[in-house]
């Protein structure tokens, strides 16, 4: 990678990879005028000009940008937000999504929780699955056998699904910020250990279950049921979401990048 970058001689290098090594960033600084890292908590992050760490808690790192202010929300969400009519009074439809791949199959864990709860089985679920999800046949068979009210959406943009959901059950990734932008109260489950470092859910008071690989199913059932049953809690969350500075992340990032000395 370094030899290719040297041949290009760019004015800026943006690293969208995790845990960059210090040596790599030092070498980049010899080549490029500006080095920007994304979601980097490795040793190299301290040497970059800017680190866009929206998903992590602010730890005071001098060159890092934290929080929803710097999260770039895709245009599709901006286009679909006008269709949001959030009513905290009733819950009818629950959106479930754990990314495009869900390698740990947290989706099936949540479906088993729903199937084992007479209360949760009464609701309708929109299950958003990505192109790399490998357990579609298992999901289809399970939902049919257990007579779950599930509408499976394959490769469907979440921006078009969130306006029609009353609550969501989501992985603890950038989707949490997208749900916040769409004013969608959500139950959050970390799909792996690294996602446990993402703490934005605390700021808006989204119910959090923990690491999906470790938590008991009872915790998931409790958190989902709590959000469905407590309309005051949902209204409280929506109020928190309405007060966020979110949606202009690209403009804020551009402003920060322009301050990097040449």
Model-derived features: positions:
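Active-site and donor-binding regions of nucleotide-sugar-utilizing enzymes
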Residues: 1-64
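A nucleotide-sugar donor-handling region in carbohydrate enzymes
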Residues: 47-105, 136
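A short, well-ordered alpha-helix in the C-terminal region of glycosyltransferases
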Residues: 226, 233-247
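C-terminal alpha-helical cap of glycosyltransferases
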Residues: 246-262
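Catalytic binding pocket for nucleotide-activated donors in carbohydrate/polymer assembly enzymes
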Residues: 176-222
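Donor-nucleotide binding loops and adjacent catalytic segments primarily
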Residues: 89-165
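Short, charged/polar "capping" segments at the starts of alpha-helices
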Residues: 22, 44, 59-60, 103-105, ...
